[in-house]
Swiss-Prot record:
Keywords for this protein: Calcium, Cell adhesion, Cell membrane, Glycoprotein, Membrane, Repeat, Signal, Transmembrane, Transmembrane helix
Protein name in UniProt: Protocadherin beta-7
Record has NAD as a keyword: no
Residues bearing carbohydrate: 169, 418, 436, 567
């Protein structure tokens, strides 16, 4: 069956144009749509997008919903096309009962922005029910003395349909004695009366069996039948007569079942069985029969079921009084049901938005409707929420309310809100309903990660393992989810000379710091860098902290003997006159340690000697002195092994081997200073030498002769007391900055001896080229200063 969709348009005259322009959809006539009952599910009713003047996309984007009072899902809105479809078959009799027209109101709710349109679905009746008599057989007793034209009330049929499909006519099977008159009760119900056409003769026909047919107005019409049995009696010339033809009574809806509503009374002037009256309902509907019952003897009307003002406000009953002779009379009882405050307000939630963003003020959290089935003040309601919440209630049309956030929320303070909506009516006593809503607050990236400290100090012992962390930093973010996930990183170094990327790394997930290589205290004692903490949001927020790394010294350098050199192919021999007194300074062992602190404190001791007890070594300065007078028995060649040990844990050591030659007497040898290695990097010096050589060949010849003479002297003096200073590997901080691998001139020495003196000492001369020191780094100068001070430079 096709659904016929109509939209009622009414023309109105208005006095002022401004009044017309100020009218809103909420106050306009509702949209009306019509559909026949029993229409198949999925039937197209209308296109709401066209009716509302909206595009299909706009209709979907605005979150259109269908809300009905009955909360029934009888309509379906297609979000793709905007079509309004029937969601289920409708039974008009079940939905509306006898009410006509059958109108189902509903609302079209648009959320973004909030807007409400009223609409109505009119369900058209179809002829799907035939008239039905409650009693298949109707019995009548008629006195034979009854005059023609007398009317006898018959039981009416019931038809659940309404309008033209409802009960419209009665007929009776053809006969000469009776016909049917149809009467309207004034409330849309018709009932039949059997009218006598001619005088009865009990002796001729004592009983009649006629068929009463009830017809409805449908097309084609439906019908129902009942058998009417008429028993012709002797004369009973008085029918029962009610004291009042109309009874009106008001009954509270909370009256208990079984309570008396009203008592009706009729009189009959006859005697005997003809005067005995029985009360009963006449053409009563099924609803009346379920709600009321009447005492057939006393005429007392009682409640059979609980009344409900919200369902039916008025009942109209027809009561018949019939005597024993078959005569009857009737009266009408009108029962008005009065309302009491027996219904709590109802909260119908249309939509709920949860979670909501914490930085979104004036956000519609929920849309709901308040309904109270009572009337008057009993149906008026007041709606409220707690005072200490950042939300407000805004009333709208048709008892709709919106719950709106009043100001920006702070998820870090409250992650959720438990809102209790209290609805109270104005009846006596007041009834209230509470509805709890939990609103979750979603996180917004409004907090940057924060380090637990503004600066960190890490202590790392040198020669550390790169696989082990040297420390960690930690930052927390008060946000949640990805907004709280922290990524750690190294920030660019502010020191351009610090190779930070090759020195340390950081674990981006947990902030653990790693040294990419083993640290060397002698090369780098401390450094600092900045680390950053960034969350994973977009845009991301970040913070930074300063990390100080202090390298702790380890005893990883053994003492290094500067003098005498131990890697020379020609051993160093020190001359010692046999006439030397005890305490005579033979030589001095000079050593340095690349470590610092107590790891660099050196002590000296004599480990081995050719003549034990002949020599002694001072523990703190390394001076080798005679311990007694020399004798002729002492060997001419003495070999001493001096142990140099630092104060580390565990201690490291080195040995120096000395050769001492005992002589009877000698003059002061002249030892030529070793030639300093040329600085190949100094091109200016080369250019100057070339220029001087080209200008004066005579000067060059003089220099060559001078060198030849010096070499001759050196060859003659070598066997006696000469100490060679050969080239060899040195600690890095002792090697010349030119990179030639030779000992820096600042550590070259000349031995000066005077014959015949028993207190001769070594004199360590100042460097020949003092301007080399400023070329070294500040750290190297600082490391060398203790050694220079010990030597008295």
């Amino acid at each position: 069956m096709e659904a016929r969709v109509e939209r009622a348009v009414q023309k109105r005259q208005v006095l002022f144009l401004c009044v017309f322009l100020g009218m809103s959809w909420a106050g306009a006539e509702p949209l009306r749509y019509f559909v026949a009952e029993e229409t198949e599910r999925g039937t197209f009713l209308t296109n709401l997008a066209k009716d509302l003047g909206l595009g299909v996309g706009e209709l979907r984007a605005r979150g259109t919903r269908i809300v009905s009072d009955q909360n029934m899902q009888i309509l379906l809105l297609s979000s793709l096309t905007g079509d309004l479809l029937l969601n289920e078959k409708l039974d008009r009799e079940e939905l509306c009962g006898p009410r006509e027209p059958c109108v189902l109101p509903f609302q079209l709710l648009l959320e973004k922005p909030f807007q409400i349109f009223r609409a109505e679905l009119w369900v058209r009746d179809i002829n799907d029910h035939a008239p039905v008599f409650l009693d298949r057989e109707i019995s009548l007793k008629i006195l034979e003395s009854t005059t023609p034209g007398a009317a006898f009330l018959l039981e009416s049929a019931q038809d659940s349909d309404v309008g033209t499909n409802s009960l419209s006519n009665y007929t009776i099977s053809p006969n000469a004695y009776f016909h049917i008159n149809v009467h309207d009760s004034g409330e849309g119900n018709i009932y039949p009366e059997l009218v006598l056409n001619q005088v009865l003769d009990r002796e001729e026909i004592p009983e009649f069996s006629l068929t009463l047919t009830a017809l409805d107005g449908g097309s084609p019409p439906r019908s129902g039948t009942a058998l009417v049995r008429i028993l012709v009696l002797d004369v009973n010339d008085n029918a029962p007569d009610f004291v009042r033809s109309l009874y009106k009574v008001q009954v509270p809806e909370n009256s208990p079942v079984g309570s008396m509503v009203v008592s009706v009374s009729a009189r009959d002037l006859d005697t005997g069985s003809n005067g005995e009256i029985a009360y009963a309902f006449s053409y009563a509907t099924e609803r009346i029969l379920k709600t009321f019952q009447i005492n057939p003897t006393s005429g007392n009307l009682h409640l059979k079921a609980q009344l409900d003002y919200e369902a039916i406000q008025t009942y109209t009953l027809t009561i018949q009084a019939k005597d024993g002779g078959g005569l009857s009379g009737k009266c009408t009882v009108v029962v008005d049901v009065t309302d009491i405050n027996d219904n709590r307000p109802e909260l119908l939630l249309s939509s709920l938005t949860s979670p909501i963003a914490e930085n979104s003020p004036e956000t519609v959290v929920a849309v709901f409707r308040i309904r109270d089935r009572d009337s008057g003040n009993n149906g008026k309601t007041v709606c409220s929420i707690q005072d200490d919440l950042p939300f407000i209630l805004k009333p709208s049309v048709e008892n709709f309310y919106t719950l709106v956030s009043e100001k920006p929320l702070d998820r870090e303070r409250n992650t959720e809100y438990n809102i209790t909506i209290t609805v109270t009516d104005l009846g006596t006593p007041r009834l209230k309903t509470e509805h709890n809503i939990t609103v979750l607050v979603s996180d917004v990236n409004d907090n940057a990660p924060a380090f637990t400290q503004t600066s960190y100090t890490l202590f790392v012992r040198e020669n550390n393992s790169p696989a082990l962390p040297i420390g960690s930093v930690s930052a927390t973010d008060r946000d949640s989810g990805t907004n709280a996930q922290v990524i750690y990183s190294l920030l660019p170094s502010q020191d351009p000379h610090l190779p930070l990327s090759s020195l340390v790394s950081i674990n981006a997930d947990n902030g653990h710091l790693f040294a990419l290589r083993s640290l060397d205290y002698e090369a780098l004692q401390a450094f600092e860098f900045r680390v950053g903490a960034t969350d994973r949001s977009s845009p991301a927020l970040s913070s930074e902290a300063l990390v100080h790394v202090l390298v702790l010294d380890a005893n990883d350098n053994s003492p290094f003997v500067l003098y005498p050199l131990q890697n020379s192919s020609a051993p160093c021999t020190e001359p010692l006159p046999r006439a030397a007194e005890p305490g005579y300074l033979v030589t001095k062992v000079v050593a340095v340690d690349g470590d610092s602190g107590q790891n660099a404190w050196l002590s000296y001791q004599l480990l081995k000697a050719t003549e034990p007890g002949l020599f002694g070594v001072w523990a703190h300065n390394g001076e080798v002195r005679t311990a007694r007078l020399l004798s002729e028995r002492d060997a001419a060649k003495q070999r001493l092994v001096v142990l140099v040990k630092d104060n580390g844990e565990p201690p490291r050591s080195a040995t120096a081997t000395l050769h001492v030659l005992l002589v009877d007497g000698f003059s002061q040898p002249y030892l030529r200073l070793p030639e300093a290695a040329p600085d190949q990097a100094n091109l200016l010096t080369v250019y100057l030498v070339v220029a001087l050589a080209s200008v004066s060949s005579l000067f060059l010849l003089s220099v060559l002769l001078f060198v030849a003479v010096r070499l001759c002297r050196r060859s003659r003096a070598a066997p006696v007391g000469r100490c060679s200073v050969p080239e060899g590997p040195f600690p890095r901080h002792l090697v010349d900055l030119s990179g030639t691998g030779t000992l820096s001139q600042s550590y070259q020495y000349e031995v000066c001896l005077t014959g015949g003196s028993g207190t001769n000492e070594f004199k360590f001369l100042k460097p020949i080229i003092p301007n080399l020191l400023p070329q070294s780094t500040g750290r190297e100068v600082e490391e060398n200063r203790p050694f220079q001070n010990n030597l008295g430079f």
